[in-house]
């Protein structure tokens, strides 16, 4: 008797039924992200979104893509998959707001060794939560089963976003000058960069049980929970600031830390002057530095050190910007440093 297509595919390692099941399970989460601009639902060949250009003179679309990196290994060891999707969204939308843009839509891509519907749904639950936090719609995605290429219990996660900004309001640093103030928006922890070094510092690959320990520095949290704290999404508070303040530059502090990311928003001839004692460094980073015997320079050149995003604003508007941030979900935002003549980052 000839086997059916699904039976043959299943024998090859791809479970079509599991794929259908995962879609059904994730629908409730995706629905949370939909708004009046979304056309159709899941299942189409492309995600449709009606672009409302009201209020835009010259709308410009901006796109971004990123993944979560080896933070996924921590999620797999901890068997906790419902927040890693927030990280994926954050890595993309936090990038596009650096241009002053509002994220509109998001799509996710999951590659896995075996499609376990409940696990896939948990991942998408996090993606949907991230989209809600960023006020954008999850209009599509793909779950690809890769038998023979990936271990059955492993997966990778990436995302893609498209946003919009008025051409005249695209952020540029032309008016940046000495005396402008740099504001810090705190991170929740390591966020989604530097985890290859984190895994080495704590020898996680050889001793995964270390993730279940509760170092005194972490105030009762397990190391795994502290490392899995989802990346903060800064979209809503930053967009509020952009409405009322002349923001001259925004940097998302990701891989490369202060030294690589802050200069990306600086005008040529300007440097970011930051006093080390003014950086509010969470205990987790001190624990990492001490455990791994990492130099201070390497810490600031790899990790966000407690600062997930920086905004540069005129000195006369710094207090106003902080008031807006404090009233819109960033109560611990603070003045980090100033712009001075020079280049790059000056940690003094």
Q: What residue spans do the PLM features occupy?
A:
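Hydrophobic face of alpha-helices
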Residues: 23, 121-124, 195
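Glycine-rich phosphate/pyrophosphate-binding loop regions near the starts of catalytic domains
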Residues: 28-188
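Short, glycine-/Ser/Thr-/acidic-enriched flexible segments
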Residues: 53-54, 67-68, 162-164, 188-190, ...
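Residue-level signature of catalytic and energy-coupling elements of molecular machines
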Residues: 15, 66, 179, 252, ...
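Buried hydrophobic packing segments
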Residues: 22, 26, 48, 92-93, ...
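Short, acidic (Asp/Glu-rich) active-site segment that either coordinates a divalent metal cofactor
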Residues: 156, 169-220
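N-terminal amphipathic/basic leader segments beginning at the initiator methionine
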Residues: 2-37
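Glycine-/charge-enriched secondary-structure boundary and capping motifs
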Residues: 2-12, 119-134, 150-157, 207-211, ...
């Amino acid at each position: 008797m000839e086997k059916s297509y699904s039976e043959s595919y299943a024998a090859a390692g791809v479970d079509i039924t599991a794929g259908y099941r995962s879609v059904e399970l994730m629908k409730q989460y995706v629905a949370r992200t939909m708004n009046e601009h979304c056309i159709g639902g899941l299942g189409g060949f492309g995600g449709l979104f009606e672009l409302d250009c009201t209020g835009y003179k010259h709308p410009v679309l901006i796109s971004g893509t990123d993944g979560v990196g080896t933070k996924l290994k921590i999620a797999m060891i901890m068997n906790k998959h419902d927040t890693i999707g927030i990280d994926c969204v954050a890595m993309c939308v936090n990038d596009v707001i650096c241009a002053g843009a509002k994220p509109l839509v998001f799509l996710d891509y999951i590659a896995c060794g075996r499609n376990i519907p409940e696990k896939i749904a948990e991942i998408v639950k996090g993606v949907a939560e991230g989209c809600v936090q960023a006020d954008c719609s999850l209009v599509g995605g793909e779950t690809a089963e890769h038998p023979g290429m990936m271990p059955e219990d492993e997966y990778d996660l990436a995302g893609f976003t498209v946003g919009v900004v008025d051409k005249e309001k695209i952020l540029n640093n032309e008016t940046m000058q000495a005396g402008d103030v740099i504001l810090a928006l705190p991170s929740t922890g390591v966020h989604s960069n530097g985890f290859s070094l984190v895994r080495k510092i704590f020898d996680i690959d050889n001793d995964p049980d270390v993730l279940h320990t509760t170092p005194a520095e972490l105030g009762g949290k397990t190391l795994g929970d502290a490392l899995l704290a989802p990346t903060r999404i800064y979209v809503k508070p930053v967009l509020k600031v952009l409405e009322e303040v002349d923001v001259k530059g925004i940097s998302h502090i990701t891989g490369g830390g202060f030294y690589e990311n802050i200069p990306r928003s600086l005008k040529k001839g300007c440097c970011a002057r930051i006093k080390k004692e003014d950086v509010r460094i969470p205990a987790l980073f001190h624990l990492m530095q001490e455990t791994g015997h990492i130099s201070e320079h390497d810490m600031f050149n790899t990790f966000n050190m407690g600062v997930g995003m920086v905004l540069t604003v005129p000195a006369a508007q710094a207090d106003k910007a902080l008031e807006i941030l404090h009233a819109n979900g960033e109560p611990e935002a603070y003045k980090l440093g100033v712009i001075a003549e020079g280049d790059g980052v000056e940690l003094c």
